[in-house]
């Protein structure tokens, strides 16, 4: 019997950036989680080339998270996970324990002052490489805005501890922006564009959806837009980042502020080609490819703002 049992094939959405421990990749509509190396040779080849590290954007610098992520992505790091979370003083002290900080008590106190943004990064010799990036680029350009793991021995444990915390969210007078799987390579730029458009990030987390959940979330578009099936395919093609945002001028205080309409305008028309004509400075005009891979999903109707943020930051977090 000479019929082939296994055959190599190329999956466009599966790239080297997506292959690391804990990643979820989609192959022929099936979501597969990478839980172990296939053999010792693969483990040896990937152990340094796909090393992971943790970066925490400090509470006072959350508005700079997009710039930090963009700097990391430009330097060759892949973003594995993102979460905005609040740490207690004890949580923060545990996180930085054994780090080389000259003022661990002060750093712990700073990390406990409000929500921070944790970013799990993957790259070549990631721990040392990101420390160099912080020293040579981030601190000179943005100030002392991040804390990062400084030991490969405990980077994974610190990442697991941070991402075990519940995601921060306000769940009131906010809107939802999803950086789609096809735009994750530009995650930092997209997040920065949203913040520059007058929004403050009040929650953020990475997600992967199976087809049932994606259909449920996008059901309002079923029978309304011809691209519905393709929209579901896009949302289930890999990890994405959901952002809860409020108007910057609120200072996180809430209030009836038209945040849904304002975010929809900042994102621009669903078709990037139209967006580039009508709203050339919009997020979709800058980062979208087509009506499906248009960089971001945003809440369309004011009455859905609370529903969509609850779906990701309460229901899926339960």
Locate each region found by the language model.
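Non-catalytic terminal and connector segments of soluble metabolic enzymes
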Residues: 24, 44-318
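Extended amphipathic alpha-helical elements
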Residues: 1-47
